[in-house]
Amino acid sequence: MTKGILGRKVGMTQVFTENGELIPVTVIEAAQNVVLQKKTVETDGYEAVQIGFEDKRAILSNKPEQGHVAKANTTPKRFIREFRDVNLDEYEIGAEVKVDVFAEGDIIDATGVSKGKGFQGVIKRHGQSRGPMAHGSRYHRRPGSMGPVAPNRVFKNKLLPGRMGGEQITIQNLEIVKVDVEKNVLLVKGNVPGAKKALVQIKTATKAK
């Protein structure tokens, strides 16, 4: 069954194992997760649990939103996400979801929005090779040929310069190194998409070996 939680990326640090091995980890703070709704096949056509994360001022929410969170006896939330393939009996509306749903050694998937890089060329954006930088070369970092003359157009999916980053990215099969229940913090091995303070969605890995 899937377990999930929402949090914010604090940054990266490192921890040492008992053998002295250094492990780079990402710190994810997962406070204020509240169950807002339990969706069932009878009422919604599918099973899922809806979780709200991080309070926001009531003046920033509309009446339907306020009525929805009132059923869970909580305040309006800034982020609302759903997790499918869950055991609905383990969740109660209005209950808080903490990091102790996970344990050390669990394999998870982390989803976030990657850092925006702005308008970038094909070398940085797609990893293409550059031309010679000297000896009379007039081709350095340009995209190169866009295709043959005959079609009179550029084919779809041609790798070209453009805006890079700012996309939803999921990194699969990351390991949880430590669970700090008191501070509601997860330490995840490796890097996680997004800048500092970015929203990160953590759930049980779908392709765990």
Swiss-Prot record:
Record has Heme as a keyword: no
Name listed for the protein in its UniProt record: Large ribosomal subunit protein uL3
Pfam families in UniProt:
Ribosomal_L3
Q: What role is this protein assigned?
A: One of the primary rRNA binding proteins, it binds directly near the 3'-end of the 23S rRNA, where it nucleates assembly of the 50S subunit.
HAMAP family (UniProt xref) = Ribosomal_uL3_B (MF_01325_B)
Q: Which GO terms describe its cellular component?
A: cytosolic large ribosomal subunit
Q: What top-level branch of life does the organism fall under?
A: Bacteria
* Oligomer and partners: Part of the 50S ribosomal subunit. Forms a cluster with proteins L14 and L19.
Gene Ontology MF terms in the entry: rRNA binding; structural constituent of ribosome
Q: Which UniProt keywords apply?
A: Ribonucleoprotein, Ribosomal protein, RNA-binding, rRNA-binding
Keyword Ribosomal protein attributed: yes
Extract the ranges annotated as region (Disordered): 126-148
Q: Which gene encodes it?
A: rplC
Extract one GO BP annotation from the record.
translation
Family named by the database record: Belongs to the universal ribosomal protein uL3 family.
Which species expresses this protein natively?
Answer: Listeria monocytogenes serovar 1/2a (strain ATCC BAA-679 / EGD-e)
Q: Which Gene3D superfamilies match?
A: 3.30.160.810, Translation factors
Which InterPro entries has this protein been placed in?
Answer: Ribosomal_uL3 (IPR000597), Ribosomal_uL3_bac/org-type (IPR019927), Ribosomal_uL3_CS (IPR019926), Transl_B-barrel_sf (IPR009000)
